[in-house]
UniProtKB/Swiss-Prot annotation:
Stated role: Catalyzes the deamination of various vicinal amino-alcohols to oxo compounds. Allows this organism to utilize ethanolamine as the sole source of nitrogen and carbon in the presence of external vitamin B12.
Subunit and partners: The basic unit is a heterodimer which dimerizes to form tetramers. The heterotetramers trimerize; 6 large subunits form a core ring with 6 small subunits projecting outwards.
Lineage summary: Bacteria, Bacillati, Bacillota, Clostridia, Lachnospirales
Primary location class: other
An annotated GO BP: ethanolamine catabolic process
Subcellular location(s) per record: Bacterial microcompartment
Cofactors, names only: adenosylcob(III)alamin
Pathway, per record: Amine and polyamine degradation; ethanolamine degradation
Identification of the protein by name: Ethanolamine ammonia-lyase small subunit
Species whose genome carries this gene: Lachnoclostridium phytofermentans (strain ATCC 700394 / DSM 18823 / ISDg) (Clostridium phytofermentans)
Keyword Lyase included in the entry's annotation: yes
Amino acid sequence: MDEQSLRKMVEQMVEQMVGGGTNVKSTTSTSSVGQGSATAISSECLPDITKIDIKSWFLLDHAKNKEEYLHMKSKTPARLGVGRAGARYKTMTMLRVRADHAAAQDAVFSDVSEEFIKKNKFVFVKTLCKDKDEYLTRPDLGRRFGKEELEVIKKTCGQSPKVLIIVGDGLSSSAIEANVEDMIPAIKQGLSMFQINVPPILFIKYARVGAMDDIGQATDADVICMLVGERPGLVTAESMSAYICYKAKHGVPESKRTVISNIHRGGTTPVEAGAHAAELIKKMLDKKASGIELKG
């Protein structure tokens, strides 16, 4: 069957479908291949949708009281007032969700750069995890070190130090790179007021919070303060926490850890968290306790 015969057959089928009320011209089915207009290519960069402040981003078309709605939104990063198109999210809302989700995935699967570690003069050690996949599927290996790594830890930290500050990548490398450089100086400055010095700082790759117990067991440190990237969400991929424990060792209950959480630019600022951590460390040294025992 040639092209002309095929075209006539299609026309007949169309006429039958519309009841014969439409006169379909053969010229209307002429192929338009090769007649498309040229595509316009712009060299301009698209704006980064993640830079929009979600607290002031208002997409409702007909709000009864926009001012009060914005006042409520200013108190929370929750996705309020995002509007809808029929039963669906608006395009901008969906793009923002996908962008925030992508940022969260990047934070989990990317590594803290070697340049960042060298710049801050951290001493690099690694847990028993071989790679990121094993780290995510075997949390137990993220709490232990090999013999060679333990020797590096002992050599760096010494025996029975009063305070150790350690950094672990955890589940968000972005959180470490965004907050550590501001928080550590704040902790050191606060501790210096109490005449407390700290040894060189360890950086732990593939770290779980329990890695501080292995370090405490090896060094017999009085207080260990661990800065670790927390599991990212759609609000932020840069949230870090500080886990502080007195006499951390194998088998220590989670209730003995004191936690400063939600450390990021939209929560507790790194400088503020650092000052608070220094005060907590001094209090732990004085009371020889941490976690819920510190409140007793």
